[in-house]
Amino acid sequence: TRNLSILGGEPLCKENLDIVHYLCSDIKKRLPKTKIIIWTGYTLHQLKIRAKNDLRIKDLLDNLLDTIVDGPYKQELRDLRLKLRGSSNQKIWERTTTKFLRRKVWKEKKED
């Protein structure tokens, strides 16, 4: 299994959406077993609202993205013990065959 990580700036902003959708679609066609993970400042809830009016977002959520790390980075919630996230407000979502579920498996253990 291969993995592709998409992050930096805001990959799902209006200006980047065409290229991100094209890239994810092309990767899934050529390498269908590739898992795509994306970091976004948008919450999953915000993306679902946008998907009602944007077929690219809908396709990303329904077919192309495997994992979403959502929510803006917040300096006041910074926690270096978190896996894949910089601040505690961010959540990890993993797509099942029909929807995204919050991934509890990656929940960090509290250190004493």
What are these regions (language model features)?
Residues 1-59:
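Conserved Radical SAM active-site core
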Residues 62, 66-112:
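Classical nucleotidyltransferase
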